[in-house]
Structures are given as structure tokens and as C-alpha cells.
Amino acid sequence: MFEIIPILAFEDNYIWLLHQHGHALVVDPGDAHPVLEILDARGLQLRAILVTHHHQDHTGGVEELIQATSAQVFAPAKEQFSFPHHPVTAGDRLDIPGIALSLSVLDVPGHTVGHVAYYGDGMLFSGDTLFGAGCGRLFEGTPGQMYSSLQQLAQLPVNTRVYCGHEYTERNLAFALSLEPHHEALLSRREATAALRAQGLPSLPSSMALELATNPFLRCHEPGIIAASKSAATDPVSVFAAIREMRNHF
């Protein structure tokens, strides 16, 4: 078995560190220093760095980690990076040296045009595509692209554990409840999330089952979300675009 450690960076970023038998990988290291501290404290050898997209808060620590370790870097083929890396795209499989784990690469454009996610062994590292009770802003992609990406992730097994790039769950739940104030699953999740955060614990990982039940961006076909969106068109992409715009100003 392996252990997954959430490393908080900046205000609300998560760098995910997975290790087994002294070998480790990290996902989206925006800052090298907290990663190096844990590697040193636990006597771990960093073998791989996985990048989901090009934003600085997810890549800022990569070059320093390359210099400090022998780690290989895997990053989206459709995006540009200044550091050496192995470009990855949909369908690629990554076998991490020293760790009994094989990950599949999923293309999930929307937040950025080349964004990828990594899935394997019941785990999804979703970057800034899927959040707890939310999804990423559309900085580069279209509503149709992001909706399609989210629907792709929604097809994963319901027991998939979801490791997101940011601690946004409480704010996302507040927005979701502004759409559906009396939704029992949302109210229950808000209570559970508040209890975790009050203890200084992450609200993550989530699960795909929980997201399917409470994430409005995965429920754009449901009558309650359609009504709350006030969208003139009721197809799921139009509803998604409407509530994503509402979330931008929430």
C-alpha cells in the first residue's frame, strides 16, 4: 500500500505526494520547499513529478525539484513548459519507478486547453478541472469543452477518490446551496466539510459518488439546476455555462 500526503501550498493549493517503499511522486508542485522538507523528513526519493496544466501555482516548484532530485517530469503535450519533461496525452499509461502504480492520462480541456488528469488504482488527480462541489474557471477553454471533460470524469467508478488542486469545497458548497437551498445532500456535505475544516483537516479527497450527488456542474441535466440557472436554453451545456458564470461572480 502507499500513503498519500496533502501538502498545502500558498493559500489554498494542494500538492499531492504519494509514496511507497521509500519512493515518491508528487502532483502539481507549485512550491518546491514543502515537498523537499517532507522528502527529507521521511527519507523519500522523488521519482516522478506529474503536472496537470501550465499555471504557475501548479508548476512553480518543478525546476527546483528537478535540480534537487532525479525525478522524471510528465506534463501535458498540448501545453508549453520551460522545464524538461515527457509530454503526455489521452491514453498514455505511466508506470512510476519504485511504486506499484499505473496511471492513465485523461485529456480534460476547459480550465486550460491542454489540461490533463491522472487516473489509476481508484484515484483521480483532477488538477483544476474537478473540485469538491465545483469545477475550474474557463481561462482558455469553452463551456462545451469543460462540460465534456466533467462528463468524462463522471463516468469513472463511483468509488473513485478525487484529489483536487485547491481547497475550495466550502465556498463551492455555499454556491451550490444558493442554487438549491434545501438540498439535503448538500446540507449534509456542508456540515461534514465544516467539521473537517474546523479541525484544520482537508475536505479532500472527495469521491465520485459524492460529486455526482452534490456537485452542480455534474448535475446540469437535473430539473433543480436547470431552474436555478435561469438559462433560456435548457440543454446541459447552456445550463453549465450559465451556472459557471454565476459562480464567477459569487
UniProtKB/Swiss-Prot annotation:
Thiolesterase that catalyzes the hydrolysis of S-D-lactoyl-glutathione to form glutathione and D-lactic acid. Keywords: Hydrolase, Metal-binding, Zinc. The lineage of its organism: Bacteria, Pseudomonadati, Pseudomonadota, Betaproteobacteria, Nitrosomonadales. NCBIfam families: GSH_gloB (TIGR03413). Its EC number is 3.1.2.6. It catalyses: an S-(2-hydroxyacyl)glutathione + H2O = a 2-hydroxy carboxylate + glutathione + H(+). Its cofactor is Zn(2+). The keyword Transcription regulation does not apply. Belongs to the metallo-beta-lactamase superfamily. Glyoxalase II family. Signal peptide: none annotated. One of its GO terms (molecular function) is metal ion binding. Zn(2+) 1 binds at H53, H55, H111, D128. It is an enzyme of class 3 (hydrolase). Zn(2+) 2 binds at D57, H58, D128, H166. InterPro entries: Clx_II_MBL, Glyoxalase_II_hydrolase, HAGH_C, Hydroxyacylglutathione_Hdrlase, Metallo-B-lactamas, RibonucZ/Hydroxyglut_hydro. Pathway: Secondary metabolite metabolism; methylglyoxal degradation; (R)-lactate from methylglyoxal: step 2/2. It comes from Methylobacillus flagellatus (strain ATCC 51484 / DSM 6875 / VKM B-1610 / KT). SUPFAM superfamilies: Metallo-hydrolase/oxidoreductase. Monomer. Binds 2 Zn(2+) ions per subunit. GO terms for biological process: methylglyoxal catabolic process to D-lactate via S-lactoyl-glutathione. This is Hydroxyacylglutathione hydrolase. Pfam families: HAGH_C (PF16123), Lactamase_B (PF00753).
